[in-house]
Amino acid sequence: MNVEPTTAAPQLASPRTGPSARLAGYLLPPYGIYLLWQQRASTLAAAFGTLGLLVYLVLYTGLGIALLKLTGKAEIDWRGYGRPRLVWSTGVRTSAAWQTSNTAIDTNSGAYWTDYRGPQRDGRYDETPIRTDWQQSPPRLLWKADLGGGHASMTIAQGRLFTMEQWAEGEAITAYNAADGKGLWKHLYPARFNDAYGMGGAGPRSTPTWHDGRVYALGAEGHLHCLDAADGRVVWQKNILEEHGTRNLMFGLCASPLVVSNAVIVTAGARAGAGRNTVIAYHKDTGAVLWAAAAENQAYMSPMRVTLAGTEQLLVTGARQLMGLSLTDGKPLWSLGWSVSYDNNIAQPLVVSTNRVFISAGYGKGCALFEIAAKDDPFTANKIWENKHLKNKFASSVLHEGHIYGLDDSGNDDAAHLVCLDASTGEPKWRADNYGHGQLLLASGHLLISCEDGNMALVKATPESHQLVARLPALDGKTWNNPALAGGKLYLRNGRMMACYDIRPDASAGTRGISTAGPEDLQVVLVAFVLMSVMGAALLVAITKLRRSQPSQ
């Protein structure tokens, strides 16, 4: 009998139910590395594949960071040492976020801190004693409130706090109730300045000046306003750059208006041609020009009313000079050369005696003491000493009992160390902790330091040694703005928020607080990686399900 040969049924290839190592590596690198070692042809191949995926992981996470930036969740922020960092975006403040105060204004509280860095613009507070036992009795937080961007400080008068900030609608001159931090009035106008590199961030830089019931405020693009301090009504306004044909500075106009007698004095950027005026005095009531001086290109410090060599005068720092001008007509009395990289004269000069003035700058420049003599016409300016022991980048120094205290720009590292110098010789007495590129004031023989990381610190002002009393959490985020002090209350702000702490000697103590802020750049990177991983895992699952649903061939 014939038996027909049987043939074996063809064996169907089993469908691929999982992703390839290559695809997994593109979508989810850690899983791709796992598959490489599970499916490896050789250890060497798996090792090379792992190395490639680790390099690719940088690009992978970078794409996640780009997505966070595009969606407005993260942004690039520059620290004082000139390097970018990733931070969470707090968004741009809008007028819809404005909260009106329902608390009575203490109009009898006086008008002491009415200028940038205090009544004399020298960072000294002498109104009342302050509490100095912060270790045992920390300052009590009275209120904290959200705020728009910018580098303005605050002035306080008759129960009102005045500042400037960047809103979505433009620059805003704002008044808050000093009792609760809520709004009283706001004046908005269309303006938004940021430098070409984005290093300074968007927003106004100068601080409003209060004088005799009026507020004088200068925006970063030259908008000068005189407002009624009670209700924000515009008394007069103009753009000083347009009016005088000058050009803006690289980092915007920063100088706070100075009121002397019937004049409000401002600096108007850099000359765009010969004979252009860069220091202007307006009538404080009408805005009419009283005098204008064709001084050199101006820099970022605020003009000061000082007495040197027996003569009251206007002290200004230009791009490459320190100079004294007549208060009556702006004519030069004396000048001396002081050049800094990028023309970045930022820190305030400091009068240390009847005829001596201290000046300092960062970017490797250093500091010097000059003596101004009035024996000749014009005056003479002679150097007493110069060194590099104290380099103020944008944090101005203070003077106490013959010694200068300031934050030294250490260069490219993330540091600004507190330094004490003998004012007469320039000899360093000590160099201590890193407080970052923050700001400081002097009160009751102590240094009040607003640290770059948002902490506040109290240090005894003594040439003997660095004596830290306490360093406590205060604000969230980078803090470059100058603090303000009035009625025994410390006002702090940055580009995100402001806060008020009670530091009167008889005030009840607060809590030390716990800083919850971590390294934001690391947080952003981790979230970017997790975001990409979740998206990659979702795609892998979808691809796997699709392959399993396809019929076998």
Please give the residue ranges for each predicted region.
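Noncatalytic, solvent-exposed loop/strand surfaces
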Residues: V58-L546, P551
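Membrane-associated alpha-helix detector
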Residues: N2-S20
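Hydrophobic, aromatic-rich membrane-embedded alpha-helical segments
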Residues: T17-W37
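Canonical hydrophobic alpha-helical transmembrane segment
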Residues: L28-Y31, G52-T61, S533
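Membrane-interfacial entry segments at the cytosolic side of transmembrane helices
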Residues: R40-V55
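Juxtamembrane low-complexity tails/linkers enriched in Ser/Thr-Pro and polybasic
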Residues: A8-L12, G32-Q38, D506-P519
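Structural signal for the C-terminal ends of transmembrane alpha-helices
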Residues: W37-A41, T544
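Short, charged juxtamembrane terminal tails flanking transmembrane helices
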Residues: V3-A8, R547-Q553
